[in-house]
Amino acid sequence: QTKIDNLVRHIDHVRNNCLLLGERLIGLKNPIGRMLIANGFIHDNSKFYGIEWEHLTDPSGDPALTKLAIHHHNVSNPHHPEYWGTIDQMPQLYLCEAVCDWAARASEFGTSLQHWIDVGAAEKFDYKINSEIYCKIMYFSGLLLDKPFKPL
């Protein structure tokens, strides 16, 4: 697949997650649902331009430029905790978008969203299980994900 195919596929996954979570939030009378749906339509647009386009997905490229492109993306997009300085400062709207992004990535890579929340993100963004931010993340991921089938 080409770089553009992978990027568009990821954005489609995130947009679909934002639509689903947004509709569920609207059903709960939460006004951020509509804004989350809107964000799904502009998610990761910065990846189409400049250093992000040139260096985010080029495995043969200069690692220093790839690192710079990742940093640029993270501090330029409010669905990344780095934009806010800390995950604890993220408004709920962008925390919801982050959860939608994480769920898309987990699906694309065949990994566990729950493991990312409990281990990967907890370590990267320095939060503890059962902290206030963890509980918010779990609430939004619980709204996004369908419940598993009950055993017969």
Question: What are the residue ranges of the model-derived segments?
Answer:
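Metal-dependent phosphohydrolase cores
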Residues: 1-152
